[in-house]
């Protein structure tokens, strides 16, 4: 029984619904369902609610304040539902900075000279003045302009884009290795938090659409970015107010669908024992969802196993030695590489530029740092995982509607879109719409799928 059949056949009485996972997808689904009168139970295996929304308190320069270590920024153009949600629950936001820098060796040879540049303006692009006369660096800039021009034309064309891997497109169009290794792959690796080599398998059409929507291939008319004032946990607190039954440090052990004659229920097993629900929403990574289903169907196995994940380790610290040597190149996002053979993406988020912090000391979140920060500067360590988007993942996204609502089971997560906060929110709201529950702002004519 698919989504449409479920909508017409289900009993409209109040239901007991389990939501597994408290990231933006689970929170938004649980918030909507609870506000509509359903008896919702929110399960979270970790020691805080929020998933990738993880605000922690630190003390720097004698002041204690919250900083975000996961979800950090959004914009009004490509996060329309998140903007409306923040308006609805009265969350304050502040303007942010999305500048980008690169620091990497010019070759894989030991002792190779380092290249440093940043994209804020001409002064930072040529932070190393010798690059004004470096043919390889100028070739990169020329190819950036060509790529922006060609992909903009592709995005605006009525013709369907070829969905070849990004790496094949770069080779076919003879883009330089400097453009690929010094700009495009570092930028893309930072955005999706995955190794640059994995980005070469990214479907071209998906990549171009994303870059076009986010203003990444435009010189002008780029969106202004924002951050939640005081930390993104403020929106988590607001959403949790609507959810009565919420269980922290309560990992779900297994989920099974149980036929009770003419009625089907869902059995959720956790440290609280075995509890029966009318419906379950699995708002976690697809591989985690599959591991929980003790009786997964062949189609569920096919879809949920198709998406890979990249583990990433984040370190919160104040050791500025990881940033570019030239302070003028310091940016909000600072990519660092040890060479083309480096298997991980390393990016240093300078939180002072991303969030309005009350301190002058640099506060940094380093994702997969190449060298350990000074131990005395470390204030926290966190592990995250980000979906890897290849052709198999895109196919799984397209097939997902076919299993939504079947066997009283729903799936949500940022993995259903581009992997960002808006995608997670949209998936949670879409599940609620499966129960005929619309987001409050839908009355203004905005579809959940708007982007």
What are these regions (language model features)?
Residues 16-42:
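N-terminal Rossmann-like FAD-binding beta1-loop-alpha1 element of flavoenzymes
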